[in-house]
Amino acid sequence: MKSKNKILAVTAFAMLSLMGCNIDPILTDSYSEDVAWSNVDNLRLNLNGFYSLIGGYYGSEVENDACTDILKMNGPRDSENLFVFGSAPITPAANPFNNWDNRHTWQLSCCRFLHNLAEHRGNFPESIANEAEAEARFFRALVNFDLAKRFGASFILHKELPVMGEKNHARCTPEECWDFIYEDLTFAAKYLPKRWDDATKDPWGEATHTGRVTQGAAWGMLARAMLYAQRWKDASDAALEVKKLGYALYKNPSRPDKGYGELFMNRRSARVDNNESIIECGYSYDDEMDYSFDYFYCPPSDGGYAEASPTEDLVSAYEMADGREFSWSDPTMKANPYVGREPRFYASILYNGAPWKGQTLYTYEGCNDGYALGGGTTCTGYYMRSE
């Protein structure tokens, strides 16, 4: 019994001793806040995480167009077809356009970044701190704009990082929402550069700034947001600021399409002189990585899955080369619907009889690339084109 009491006493003493110790292990699987905010390189790496918000618009969200009149999913049971034809009604619990949780999470992430930047602002030159704040505020405006246009401009709007445990936040008014988006984007337009200096390298020797948002991106996003807000003067003024920055169509006179198709095929690393791109999502291509677009949208004879196809509504929207509108009511146009169309048509649409990779593409029913039940081939007679 005495031995047992001694063991208990020693154990209790050891536990009390440990409670008095300052055990602060060094984490080896993540960086501390001090490291993340210690220099300009780390600051910009921290900002890189926000750019997935732009990439999302060029991923699966492209297929949201299949709920409109310009794109059609080829699989009969694809969710977009089920929603459009009412087989799967849209409800609060089943909404293909729902990004409420995602955008509110990003809203808080932006506020957290700005809060931490304010605490560590002294580590950076004022110009760098202003640039970083401008980038973060651009993305905060982007997610708030996304919430406003999908759910209405009255939601819980966090202008600062909320206090832990704080509840019952009031919803903002539409005026407060649009004013806040306006303030964030005008700040971004003021402090973002017109063009980033790609001579600046990251710690791995690569250019860090290709594809970063610019002054033009901020003005352009503001123009679009103010259209949704029905603030026509603000939208017009912002669009004029974009125009002043000297953006112009990308041109290559040596190509039949004058460079339109080439614009989307230039490697991001090529440093192409491109004055058309205002906001872009670049694809870091190398010889060991395939671009999934080729599989998901190319014709089956080319090894593709043909997940979605452009509709006749979209195809007919392309004009004739002389600027006239295309019309099936015109006997001449109807006789040769794919002759004499504008260059963008031939760079974007694969049609019956189109030349494609050294062969002629046929999309009529019964051929390899024609309509068939079950998906995997076109249901409209057309395919998207990306050379």
Model-derived features: positions:
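Hydrophobic, small-residue-rich alpha-helical packing segments that form membrane-like cores
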Residues: E160-P162, E166-Q230, S236-L263
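Conserved, well-structured interaction surfaces
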Residues: N39-G56, D78-G152, E166-D179, L185-R195, ...
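Flexible, polar/acidic helix-loop-strand segments at domain edges
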Residues: N275-E276, P331-E387
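Bacterial Sec-type N-terminal signal peptides, specifically the leucine/valine-rich hydrophobic h-region
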Residues: L18-G20, N144
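Bacterial N-terminal signal peptides
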Residues: V10-S17
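Membrane-proximal, proline-rich intrinsically disordered regions
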Residues: C21-N64, Y318-R324, D330, A335
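Bacterial N-terminal signal peptides that target proteins for export
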Residues: M1-A9
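Polar, glycine-rich mid-to-C-terminal structural blocks
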Residues: L227-R231, V242-K334
